[in-house]
Amino acid sequence: MLILNEEQYAKNIYENKNTDIKTVLLKIGYLTRYFLHSLNKSDSDNYKETVNWMKKYHSNFDESCYSNLISDAVKKAYKRPFYSIDKIKITKSELEKIASLNNLRAEKVLFVLLCMAKQQSVSNGFTDGLVKYSITELCKTARISVPAEDREYILHNIVQNGLLGYPKKNNTQCLIVNFINDEDEVVIELDELDCQELAYAY
């Protein structure tokens, strides 16, 4: 899923309505940012509220094990205000480029990458169609069942068609979506609900 309204996403975590985050580090990161940016808590109150939340909702929580991590997250929260995206807009020419692959699995993967690139341009400040991805999560979001050894082949095929490229410094899992055209006619607008199941929006 893609997050469009990060403050609402963090609030759902705070209210224990969002259980899809499994890692403690991510939970603490969202909580400390929520306490700072949404509830205007001081650093000391931010720490206390985060500890109280973890004690309430995280089984076997031991403050001594997480004290440094929480303190660090409280400091880092200042550098990460929440972002908000109204809708992800897909244009006619973008859809035509995707459809030109004539392969449904590849089309779904590319559609997801396009949406991710548009979201990450706001969430991460990426430019020029840069998108960070995990091949496992990409296939999961696209709802395609592909043997592990064939997953990179799908991406390679899309690259060969000129629709994806690699950044000059490719030391991370990043690609460049080469066909973004925000100036064309908008034919699809994806809201928060749509972005929970992108594969079904294509």
Predicted regions and their residues:
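Modules that initiate DNA replication and primer synthesis
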Residues: 1-106, 114-129, 133-179, 187-189
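Short, amphipathic alpha-helical interaction segments positioned at domain boundaries
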Residues: 178-202
